[in-house]
C-alpha cells in the first residue's frame, strides 16, 4: 500500500449568486488539481452560491440553483476519480445548514453540516443557518430527484462523520470551527483522522493573517496530521475582501502557501506528503496517545478509493516552507486595490472618478487606484487572459493592452480638484502634481459660482446672508457655509462621473470614490452628503495613522515623489477663509483631539467594548504619565459627546473596504442607536465622581507626569 498522498486546496474568487461563473471556477480548480496528481480537492466555504448571499439564503431559489450546480459538477467528467469537497447550503428536515458536500465519481459520500457558526463582527450566519448540534451522529438525507438520477442514490449520509479510504482517514471542519475553544480537529485527530480539511469564508483584516496561520500550525503541532485550508478570495459583492491564504500544513509546519492578494480567479495549491510522517510524529507524543486511547469514535463512511498509489516510493515529497507575511503597508496597498478591481470589473462601469483635494486621504485613495493598475499590468504581463479581457471591456477597446500603470490609470481614473476661494494654491499644486505622476485624467474647476448661487437662493428667500466666523458670523453660519461647499462638491462629483467620459466621446460612466478614513467616520468629522458620500470608499476602514504610513510607503515603492509635499502639509479641509493666503483651519484643531488619540478611543470603544466610564478607567493607566485624571475625563467626555452627536452620519456612510476591527460601519459591523442623549448624564457623573475621589486622595501625584 502506498504512503504518499497528493492533496489540493484552493482559493476561488467566487461571486454571490453568480452560479454560472462559480461553477466554471470550481471546475477549473478541480481540473488543475487532477493535472497535478491530486486525489482530493478542497474548495472554499459555500463556494457554489458564493459566501456573501446574505438574505438570499432565505430564498428557495438559492437552494435550487446550488443543487443544479452540484448536478453539473457530478455530471462533469472533470470530477471523476478525485474526491471533491464543495460548499453549499442544504435544507434538511426544513432546517437550513451550511454544508460540505463530498463526492467521488458521481456518488455523494457525505454531507457534513457546519457545527459552529460565525456570528460576530461582520458575520451573521445564525441569521440564515442552524448549527448541527449532534456530535458524531449521522442521518439519511433524501437527495433531490435531479441528484438521484445522476448518482443512483436515494439518500446520502448527513451529519458529523469522517471518510475512511483504503489508506487514510479524512475529517472536515468548516471555518469558524477552527477558531472555537474545542475545535473538531482535536477529537478527530485523537480518533485517528490523519487529514483535516477546513473550508473557510474568512475576510481580510489588517494584521490578521498570522492568527490564521498560527491556528493551523498549532493544531497540527499538538496533535499531528495534515491540514488543508481553503478560502474564498476577492470581493463577492459587498464591503469585505476575502484574502485567500490557502495553505497546506503538516505536523506544525507549512508546506504550501497561497497568495493573500491576487487577481487570479482560481489559485490551486497541491502538496505531496507522507502519511508515515504523521504516524511517526503522533507515535512519540505520549500525552496525545493516552487521550486517543479514550477517544470516542466518529462514524466512518467507507470509501472504495485511495489517495496514494501502490508504487510511490520514488515520488518526491513537498518540503516545509517559511510563511511570508505582508507588512501592514503592503496589505493596504494590495487588499483595497484588489477589491477595487473586482468592484470595477463586475459593476460594468468605465472607471473611477476621485475628488482629489491635495490632502493625505484622497491622495491615499489615488495611490490605491494606481496600485490596482500596477497589479493589473503585472497580471497581464504574466499572461492572465481573463484580466486582459476585463481591461478591454472596461476601456471599451477590444485591442487595448496596457503598457504600464500610468497608461492604464489614464484610461480608468479621472481626478478632479474642486477649488473654492478658501482653497490654497498649495493644495491645487499638490493635487495636479500627483495626478501627473500617476497618469490620471485630471480636471480642475472652481465651485464658487455654485456656492454663490445656492447661498443666494437662501438670501433671496430669507433676506439673511450668512457669514463665516472670520467675517463676524456665528458658529451656526460658519458651519452651514462650510457644508454648502462640501455638498456642492458631491453633486459635481456625480455630474462629472456620469458625463465626463461622454464629453470626451467615450462610452460608459464612472464610479465615484470616497476618501473618508475610519477615524473621521468614528467621530463624525465629515459633512453628511459631501464627498464622503460616494459609490465606494477604499480607505473607509483604515486609520489616519496607517494611511500616513501607506502614503510614505508609496513614495518609496512607486516613486511618487509628489506625495512628499502632501504628507508633510497640515491636514485641513479648507472650508474656511484663508488668513493672508495661508490655511487657518486644521483638522485636529477642529476635532479637539489628535488622530492618534482618536484611534485609541476607537479601539477601546469597539474592540475592548468600553463605554465612557470603562474607557476613562482604562486611560487613567495608559496615559498616567502624560495626563491628569481631570484631563483624561475631559478627553473621554468630549469624544463620546462628539461621537454620539454625529452617530446619525454612520447610517448613510458610503460602503467602505473593511480593514479595521474598530470600524463604526453601521450596515452590519457596528450596530448602535443613532439618537443618543449626548450629555451622557449618568455615565459622565460616574467619571466626575471618580475624578473627585482621586483628586482628594492624592492631589500632589496627579500632575500627569512622573
UniProtKB/Swiss-Prot annotation:
**MF-aspect GO terms:** ATP binding; glutaminase activity; NAD+ synthase (glutamine-hydrolyzing) activity
Q: Which CDD domains match?
A: GAT_Gln-NAD-synth (cd07570), NAD_synthase (cd00553)
Q: Reaction catalysed by this chain?
A: deamido-NAD(+) + L-glutamine + ATP + H2O = L-glutamate + AMP + diphosphate + NAD(+) + H(+)
EC? 6.3.5.1
Renumbered to this chain, region (Ligase) spans 325-706
Q: Which UniProt keywords apply?
A: ATP-binding, Ligase, NAD, Nucleotide-binding
Q: Ranges for the CN hydrolase domain?
A: 5-275
| Pathway per the UniProt entry | Cofactor biosynthesis; NAD(+) biosynthesis; NAD(+) from deamido-NAD(+) (L-Gln route): step 1/1
Catalytic residues, chain numbering? 45 (proton acceptor), 114 (for glutaminase activity), 175 (nucleophile), 357
An individual GO BP term: 'de novo' NAD biosynthetic process from L-tryptophan
Q: Per its UniProt record, what Pfam families does this chain match?
A: CN_hydrolase (PF00795), NAD_synthase (PF02540)
Q: Where is the signal peptide?
A: none
What's the top EC group for this one? ligase
- Residues annotated for ATP binding in this entry: 355-362
GO CC annotations?
cytoplasm
Q: Which family does it belong to?
A: In the C-terminal section; belongs to the NAD synthetase family.
Q: Which NCBIfam families match?
A: nadE
Function of the protein: Catalyzes the final step of the nicotinamide adenine dinucleotide (NAD) de novo synthesis pathway, the ATP-dependent amidation of deamido-NAD using L-glutamine as a nitrogen source.
User: What name has this protein been given in UniProt?
Assistant: Glutamine-dependent NAD(+) synthetase
Amino acid at each position: 500500500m502506498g504512503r504518499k498522498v497528493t492533496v489540493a486546496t484552493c482559493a476561488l474568487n467566487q461571486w454571490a449568486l453568480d452560479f454560472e461563473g462559480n461553477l466554471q471556477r470550481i471546475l477549473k480548480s478541480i481540473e488543475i488539481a487532477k493535472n497535478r496528481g491530486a486525489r482530493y480537492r478542497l474548495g472554499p466555504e459555500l463556494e457554489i452560491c458564493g459566501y456573501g448571499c446574505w438574505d438570499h439564503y432565505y430564498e428557495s431559489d438559492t437552494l435550487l440553483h446550488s443543487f443544479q450546480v452540484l448536478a453539473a459538477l457530478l455530471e462533469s467528467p472533470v470530477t471523476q476519480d478525485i474526491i471533491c469537497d464543495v460548499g453549499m447550503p442544504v435544507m434538511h428536515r426544513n432546517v437550513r445548514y451550511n454544508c460540505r458536500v463530498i463526492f467521488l465519481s458521481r456518488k455523494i459520500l457525505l454531507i457534513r453540516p457546519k457545527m459552529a457558526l460565525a456570528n460576530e463582527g461582520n458575520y451573521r450566519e445564525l441569521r440564515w443557518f442552524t448549527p448541527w448540534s449532534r456530535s458524531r451522529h449521522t442521518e439519511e438525507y433524501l437527495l433531490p430527484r435531479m441528484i438521484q438520477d445522476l448518482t443512483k442514490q436515494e439518500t446520502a449520509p448527513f451529519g458529523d462523520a469522517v471518510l475512511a479510504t483504503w489508506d487514510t482517514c479524512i475529517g472536515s471542519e468548516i471555518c469558524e470551527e477552527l477558531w472555537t475553544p474545542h475545535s473538531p480537529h482535536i477529537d478527530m485527530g485523537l480518533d485517528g483522522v490523519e487529514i483535516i480539511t477546513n473550508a473557510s469564508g474568512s475576510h481580510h483584516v489588517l494584521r490578521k493573517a498570522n492568527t490564521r496561520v498560527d491556528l493551523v500550525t498549532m493544531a497540527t503541532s499538538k496533535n499531528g496530521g495534515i491540514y488543508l485550508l481553503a478560502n474564498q478570495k476577492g470581493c463577492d459583492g459587498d464591503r469585505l475582501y476575502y484574502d485567500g491564504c490557502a495553505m497546506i500544513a503538516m505536523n506544525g509546519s507549512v508546506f504550501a502557501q497561497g497568495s493573500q492578494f491576487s487577481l487570479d480567479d482560481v489559485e490551486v495549491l497541491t502538496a505531496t506528503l507522507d502519511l508515515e510522517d504523521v504516524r511517526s510524529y503522533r507515535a512519540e507524543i505520549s500525552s496525545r496517545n493516552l487521550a486517543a486511547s479514550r477517544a470516542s469514535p466518529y462514524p466512518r463512511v467507507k470509501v472504495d478509493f485511495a489517495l496514494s498509489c501502490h508504487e510511490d516510493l520514488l515520488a518526491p515529497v513537498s518540503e516545509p516552507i517559511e510563511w511570508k507575511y505582508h507588512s501592514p503597508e503592503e496589505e493596504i496597498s494590495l487588499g483595497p486595490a484588489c477589491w477595487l478591481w473586482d468592484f470595477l470589473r463586475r459593476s460594468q462601469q468605465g472607471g473611477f472618478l476621485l475628488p482629489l483635494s491635495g490632502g493625505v486621504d484622497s491622495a491615499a485613495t489615488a495611490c490605491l487606484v494606481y496600485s490596482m493598475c500596477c497589479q493589473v499590468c503585472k497580471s497581464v504581463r504574466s499572461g492572465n487572459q481573463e484580466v486582459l479581457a476585463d481591461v478591454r471591456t472596461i476601456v471599451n477597446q477590444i485591442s487595448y493592452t496596457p503598457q504600464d500603470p500610468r497608461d492604464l490609470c489614464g484610461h480608468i481614473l479621472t481626478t478632479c480638484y474642486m477649488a473654492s476661494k478658501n482653497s490654497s494654491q498649495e493644495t491645487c499644486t499638490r493635487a495636479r502634481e500627483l495626478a501627473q505622476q500617476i497618469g490620471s485624467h485630471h480636471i480642475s474647476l472652481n465651485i464658487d459660482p455654485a456656492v454663490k448661487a445656492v447661498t443666494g437662493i437662501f438670501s433671496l428667500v430669507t433676506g439673511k446672508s450668512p457669514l463665516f466666523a472670520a467675517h463676524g458670523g456665528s458658529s451656526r453660519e460658519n458651519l452651514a457655509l462650510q457644508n454648502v461647499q462640501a455638498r456642492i462638491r458631491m453633486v459635481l462629483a456625480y455630474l462629472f462621473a456620469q458625463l465626463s467620459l461622454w464629453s470626451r466621446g467615450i462610452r460608459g460612466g464612472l464610479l465615484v470614490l470616497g476618501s473618508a478614513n475610519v477615524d473621521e467616520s468614528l467621530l463624525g468629522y465629515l459633512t453628511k452628503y459631501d464627498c464622503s458620500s460616494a459609490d465606494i470608499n477604499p480607505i473607509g476602514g483604515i486609520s489616519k495613522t496607517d494611511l500616513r504610513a501607506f502614503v510614505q510607503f508609496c513614495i518609496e515603492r512607486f516613486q511618487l515623489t509628489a506625495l512628499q509635499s502632501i504628507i508633510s502639509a497640515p491636514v485641513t479641509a479648507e472650508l474656511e477663509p484663508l488668513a493672508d493666503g495661508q490655511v487657518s483651519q486644521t483638522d485636529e484643531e477642529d476635532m479637539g483631539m489628535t488622530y492618534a488619540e482618536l484611534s485609541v478611543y476607537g479601539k477601546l470603544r469597539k474592540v475592548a467594548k468600553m463605554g465612557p466610564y470603562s474607557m476613562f478607567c482604562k486611560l487613567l493607566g495608559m496615559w498616567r504619565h502624560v495626563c491628569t485624571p481631570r484631563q483624561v475625563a475631559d478627553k473621554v467626555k468630549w469624544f463620546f459627546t462628539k461621537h454620539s452627536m454625529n452617530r446619525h452620519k454612520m447610517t448613510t456612510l458610503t460602503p467602505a473596504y473593511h480593514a479595521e476591527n474598530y470600524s463604526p460601519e453601521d450596515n452590519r459591523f457596528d450596530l448602535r442607536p443613532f439618537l443618543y442623549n449626548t450629555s451622557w448624564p449618568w455615565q459622565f457623573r460616574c467619571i466626575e465622581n471618580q475624578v473627585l475621589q482621586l483628586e482628594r486622595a492624592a492631589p500632589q501625584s496627579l500632575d500627569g507626569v512622573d
